Amino acid sequence: MEPVSAECQLPPEDDLLEMMMEQSFTEPEEKSKDKSTRKIIPKTKLCRGLNNRYCVLNVKEVYAQGEEKHLTITASQEGDDLELCILKDDWVALHIKPGDIIHLEGNCAFDNTWTISRDTGYLILYPDLLISGTSIANGIRCLRRSVLSEKFKVCDKGSRQMLIGTMLHDIFQRATTRGFTDSVLQELAHHTVHGPKYLKEMYQLKLNQTDVMGEVQEYLPSFAKWAIDFMTHPLNQHQINVTRPTAGDPTEATKVSEFLDIEENIWSPRFGLKGKIDVTARVKIHQKSKSHLKIMPLELKTGKESNSIEHRSQVVLYTLLSQERREDPEAGLLLYLKTGNMYSVPGNRLDRRELLKIRNELSYYLTNVVHKSDNGSKEITLASLPALIADRQACKFCSQMRNCALYSRSVEQQIENCYIPAEMIPVVQKETEHLNKDHLQYFRLWYLMCTLEGNSKDSKMGRKNIWMMSSSEREEDGQCIGNLIRTGPVQTISDGQHLHSFQRKSGTVPATNLMSGDRVVVSGEDKFLALSSGYIKEVKHNNITCILDRSLGKLPEDLLFRLDHEEGGGGLESHLGNLSRLMENSPVSDKLRKLIIDFSKPNFVQHLSSVLPSDAKDIVANILKGLNKPQKQAMKRVLLSKDYTLIVGMPGTGKTTTICTLVSTLHLKTCTSCLVDDHREAAGTHRSHRHSKGTVNLGKQKRQHRVTSTTSSTSAKCRSKTEPAVSAENKKLQKLISGSHVCIMVNGHKTFSQNNYIIFFDNILLLKKLPLHYMCAFALIHHQCFKGCVKSVSLVRELGMSESLFKRLERNQEAVVQLTVQYRMNSQIMALSNKLVYEGRLECASDRVSNAVVKLPHIKTLLLELEFRESQESMWIKDVLEPSNPVCFLNTEKIPALETEEKGGISNWIEAKLVFCLTKLFLKAGCRPSDIGIIAPYRQQLKVISNYFNSLSASAVEVNTVDKYQGRDKSVIIVSFVRSNIDGKLGDLLKDWRRLNVALTRAKHKLIMLGCVPTLSRFLCLEQLICHLKSKNHIYDLPAGAHEHMPV
C-alpha cells in the first residue's frame, strides 16, 4: 500500500525533493531551484559536525506504518547537499516550518538520513536561542508561565523566602572554599546577613537582621552534617542510588572529594540551553570493588524537600550543560539544605528527551511571537501564547498571573478561535477589571512594538555570532579580539568584579571597534564558551583590561582567550516589565495610567507658601541667586506641581545647574526625598560632584557599580519618614535616603520606593521610566533634540515607539517651561542650531559667552611657520586655525575623499588623516588635548582615527560617537561626517536631525566639520545646514590632494 502524504506549510514553489527528482537539469530550472531555496534560507551560518546547523527547506507529513514528518534539510547556504530528517513517534508534534534552523543529535545514515524517534537522536529547534534550565523546568506544569517569565523577567517580586534562599546559597558556596565547621559557618552567616550585599533587599522587604539571622542559623547544622556525611566519612558509610546508563548496580557509595567551581556559567548552543550550576564538584563513586571520579553538577534547594519533577529536571538539564565543558556526567546531585539530604538524579535519555521537547516548545513560542497578514497587507499582529491551564489554585499563586490575564484579554480574546478555558474567563476578567479599553489597547500596542524591536536586535546583533564565527572572522567586523593570553594576576575589586589584563599572544592588539565601557563575553579560543562577562576598562596598543564578573585566575596560563562584543537586546525585559507595572491595580499605577494613557491634566497648587516651610523664604532666595529668569520659572513650576513638570532644556542652558538647584530647594519641602535619573554619564558625574554632600550614587558609573554616600548637613531640617523594623545598618541607609534626599543615576532601584519626587532626563523610550512607580510627582528635563537609541525597525517607528514620554505629555502646555539662555556656545556656533532647530529662541547668556574664542597661545608662532612653508594647496589652513572663525566646513569633494565600506562598517581614511593633522596643528598652537573632541557617526571611522592617534602622545584627545557626547562639550570639536560616494548611498545615521543637532552643539569656541558637500546634501537635514553655511561663507573647498600637503 502506497503511503499517503499531505504537505505542511510548503514554500511558494514546488516541493524541492520532487523538483530534484524530476528536473531536466536545464539552466532555467536550476535558477528556479536556487531562487526557491535562497528565499527560504535565512542569513545565518549553516554547518555540519558536532555543533551542526541545518535549515529546514520543506516539511512533509507522511502516514505509513505510523505518522511521520519528513524534513528536507541543508547545511549549505546555497541549498545544495540536501539531507532528510525523519521525525517519528511523539516528535511529530513538533511545531516546525520551512526556514527554521535546527540542530541534530544522533547518527546520520549513509544515505544522509537522520532519524529522530523515541529511542534515537534529538532535534533542537532554534538552537541559538539559549533558554535557562529553570524556565524549562517551570514549563513542565505550565508552559505559558515559562514563556511569560522569559518576557517579563523583572516582574517576579522578591520575597522573604527568596532572599533567605539566596543568602543560604551564598553561605554554602563560600563554605566550599572555607570549610563547613560550625565556627566558619557562623562567621559566613554573620558576614552575609550583616554585610552590605543584601542590605537593600532587606530594607525593601522591611526585614530585621536579627530575625533573618535566626532563620539562616536553622540551616547551618544541616550544612555541617552534610559535609560530615559526604565529605569526611569513609567512602562506604553513605550510599545514594546513582542510576547511570553505563553503570550496573544502582547502589553506589558517593563522596564529594573536591569543589571545582560555584555558579559556573555555561552556554550550550548545542542543546539551546544556558544556566549557572550552583556547585560543580568532583565526586568519588564506589561500586562493588571499583571506584572512579566523576565531575557532577550539585544543585542546592532551600525550600521543602519535595524531590519534585521540577527540581530533578533542573539537574537533568545541568547534565546536558556540563557536556560543553567536560564528558557527560550521566547524573547530577540534588541537595536540600534544610535537611542535608542529597539525592542522585540520573540523566537518562527519557528525561532528557522530554525536557528538550519542552525546550523546543518554549523556543517556538518565544520566536514565533507575531503573525503577518496572509491577505497581502502589511498588518502584523501578536500571536497567541500556550493555552491557559484550567487550574485556579495554581494560578492564584502564580507570579505571572497579571501578565497572563493581561495578554489573554488584550491580545488573545481578539484572536479568532483562540482557546480559553471557560472556567478561566472570570479569573481573567477579575484580574483586569480595573483596566479600560484604552489601557488594554495601549498594552497590546507597546507589547507588539517591544517585541518587533527586540526581534530585530536579536537578528541583527544576536550573540550567536560568538559561537558561530571564528575570532578572526569577528575581528574583521571589529567586534572581537582573539588570540589573547592573560597577563599578570587577577585583581579582585569587589564581589563580582575582577580586573583582568590581556595581551595578544603574538603582535599588538588589532584595530577594533571595541571601546571602554563596551560589554564583552570572554571565551576560550577553541572551547569553553562564555567563561565570564563584563566591561572593557581600557584598550591600548599592546594590552586590553576588563572588569569581569568571574575570576579566570585558576585557568591554565597558556589558555588562549577571545573577547566578543555583546550587544544587549535593548532592554526589552525592562520595557515589558515597566509596561506590566503600568497595568497593575495600585494607586500609583492608576495615577500614571490617567496621566500617560488617558491624558488627564496635571494638577498644581496655587501658592508656594503651601509647599514650603514659613521660615524657608531667605534660604530659597539664597539658593536662587545666580539663576536666570527661565531657570527660576522652572523652579517655581516644579515646586507647585502635584503631578509633573516638563522642562525644555536647550543645549548649554544649564540643565545640570537647574537639577542641582531643584534638589537643594526640594530639601526644604516637608517629607520630600528626591531621585535624579540621568542616562548621560558625564552630566551625572558632574552633578554628583556638585552634590557630593547629600547624595546616594547607585547605578552604572562607567559600567562599574559602586555606592558612595554621605549625609547632608541640611538634612536635619527635614522630618524623617516612619522607619520599618530594620537593623541599625538598615536605619543608616533609610536615614540617608529620607534625610539627604538625593539619589543620582538610580535607574529605578527598588530600594527607593519611599522617595516621592523624581527628576530625570527624558530618554526616547516612554517605557524606560521605571522610577515613575516610586513617585508622587516628577519633572522631565527634556532636550527636544536629545538623541536616544535609534530604532532599527521602521515599522516600530511608524507604530509610535520613538515617541518620548515628554512628547506624549507636552499637549498639556500648562506643565511646560523652557530654558532658552545658554552658557556654552559663542554666537556663531549657536546660530547653526538656532536657525535649523530652535527658530531663534536660543540666546547667549552674556556678551562674554557670545564673543568667546578658542585660546591658542602659540598661534602666532605657528602662523609664521606656516607662512614660511606656504604653498597654494594649504592656504585654507590659516583660515581654519583663525580663532575669529568659529565655524568652518571643509568640503572634501575635490580631493576626493571617498568612503570605504568594510565588514566592520564605513570609514573615510582621507577624512581621518585630515582630522589627525588638524588636531596636531591645534595642539601645536597651544590648545590643550583635553579641550579637543573628535566626533564621527560610525565606529569604524573612530577606529581609523584612533589608529592615527596611537602614535601621538595626546591620549586626552577624545575620539567618540555623537551619542557618547550627549550632555558634554569641548572648546574645539572636529566632526567627520564620513559619507562620500557617487552612487547615492546614504544610510540612516546621518538622516537623524537630533543626532546632527547634538554634534553641532558640543563646541564652545570652534566647530570644524569635514565632509563631501554633494553627498551630504542628499540628506535633508544636512542640506539645510549646508545652505546656511554657504550663506555665511563658512564652507571652504579643499584643493585636490589636500591631505598630502598638510604641514605636519
From Swiss-Prot:
- What segment(s) does the record annotate as region Helicase activity? 522-1048
Q: Which GO terms describe its cellular component?
A: mitochondrion; nucleus
The protein's UniProt keywords, in alphabetical order, are:
4Fe-4S, ATP-binding, DNA damage, DNA repair, DNA replication, DNA-binding, Endonuclease, Helicase, Hydrolase, Iron, Iron-sulfur, Metal-binding, Mitochondrion, Multifunctional enzyme, Nuclease, Nucleotide-binding, Nucleus
| One Gene Ontology term of the molecular function aspect | ATP hydrolysis activity
Entries under InterPro entries matching the protein: Cas4_exonuclease, DNA2/NAM7-like_C, DNA2/NAM7_AAA_11, DNA2_Rift, DNA_replication_fac_Dna2_N, P-loop_NTPase, PDDEXK-like_dom_sf, SF1_C_Upf1
The protein's required cofactor(s) are namely: [4Fe-4S] cluster
Cellular location of this protein?
Nucleus; Mitochondrion
| Pfam families in the record | AAA_11, AAA_12, Dna2, Dna2_Rift
Region (Nuclease activity) residue spans: 86-521
| EC numbers, comma separated | 3.1.-.-, 3.6.4.12
Comp. bias regions, Polar residues: 707-717
GO BP annotations, alphabetical order: base-excision repair; DNA double-strand break processing; DNA replication; DNA replication checkpoint signaling; DNA replication, Okazaki fragment processing
Q: What is its main location?
A: nucleus
Q: Where does [4Fe-4S] cluster bind?
A: C142, C395, C398, C404
Keyword NAD annotated: no
Q: How is the cofactor bound?
A: Binds 1 [4Fe-4S] cluster.
Q: Where is this region: Disordered?
A: 683-724
Catalytic reactions of this protein: ATP + H2O = ADP + phosphate + H(+)
Q: Which family does it belong to?
A: Belongs to the DNA2/NAM7 helicase family.
Q: What is this protein called?
A: DNA replication ATP-dependent helicase/nuclease DNA2
